[in-house]
Swiss-Prot record:
Cofactor: Mg(2+)
Pfam families documented for this protein: CarS-like (PF01864)
Sequence similarity: Belongs to the CDP-archaeol synthase family.
Keyword set includes Iron-sulfur: no
EC number: 2.7.7.67
Membrane-spanning intervals of the chain: 3-23, 51-71, 77-97, 122-142
Protein name per its UniProtKB record: CDP-archaeol synthase
């Protein structure tokens, strides 16, 4: 396994998913679901999924996610964009599932919270690029640990209300 390629592959989705929380610092946020409910009467995504967070995640995931490739040339800017937008869409799907299961915003839902963004990102990426299964397995193994650590950091920095 090429560890450099592995890092460069998972970096854009990690940055996209992790930086969306920065929108919590905005006084005014616009929920992606516009406050609308699904047929079950529950919010589609909830207040935690905003246009501001999506755009922050997409831009940082794309550009900061791509930045190491200026030196190493493994991924293109388009690759970083695809990995980032797919990660954010995967996170939205996870929020949709959590609302259907009556889980409140911020409620820990292992492994949904930890893997939705990454697996969606890698699945979409494999539609046009080959990824060895060993990279996917390695990402699934290390992501919950990295997710927990980064969530605690975000909590202590007061970017998140819960440490999970």
């Amino acid at each position: 396994m090429d560890l450099l390629y592995f890092f460069l592959l998972i970096w854009p989705p990690y940055v996209a998913n992790g930086s969306a929380v920065l929108a919590n610092k905005f006084k005014i946020r616009h929920p992606i679901d516009f406050g609308k409910t699904f047929v079950d009467g529950r919010r589609i995504f909830g207040d935690g999924k905003t246009y501001e967070g999506f755009l922050i995640g997409l831009s940082t995931g794309t550009f900061i996610g791509y930045a190491p490739n200026l030196l190493y040339k493994h991924l293109s800017l388009l690759d970083a964009f695809v990995l980032s937008i797919a990660a954010l869409l995967g996170d939205l799907f996870g929020a949709f599932i959590k609302r259907r299961l009556c889980m409140p915003r911020g409620y820990p839902a292992f492994p949904l919270d930890q893997l939705d963004f990454l697996l969606t990102s890698l699945a979409v990426y494999t539609l046009y690029k080959d990824i060895s299964v060993e990279y996917i397995i390695a990402a699934v193994i290390i992501t919950p640990l990295i997710h927990r650590i980064t969530n605690y950091i975000a909590y202590y920095l007061r970017l998140k209300k819960e440490p999970w």
